[in-house]
Swiss-Prot record:
GO terms for cellular component: extracellular region. GO terms for molecular function: sodium channel regulator activity; toxin activity. It comes from Calliophis bivirgatus (Blue Malaysian coral snake). Its main location: secreted. Transmembrane segments: none annotated. This is Delta-elapitoxin-Cb1a. Keywords: Disulfide bond, Ion channel impairing toxin, Neurotoxin, Secreted, Toxin, Voltage-gated sodium channel impairing toxin. It is found in: Secreted. It comes from the Eukaryota.
Length: 57
């Protein structure tokens, strides 16, 4: 699985074994956080998880 991992859409990472979801969320409605995860993060505004390549755009 390949996910975006920075605020820039041209930078991606290959997820490690066991992390089968891409995610993004906003902290304080300003900062965008992206990456790979095993479970969807909770407790953040506008959290989105998905399971296809580069789906956390």
């Amino acid at each position: 699985l390949e996910c975006y991992d920075t605020i820039f859409k041209w930078h991606t990472m290959t997820c490690p074994e066991g992390q089968n979801l891409c995610f993004y969320y906003f902290t304080w409605r300003i900062f965008l956080v992206r990456g790979c995860t095993a479970t969807c993060p909770v407790g953040y505004s506008h959290t989105h998880c998905c399971d296809t390549d580069k789906c956390n755009n």
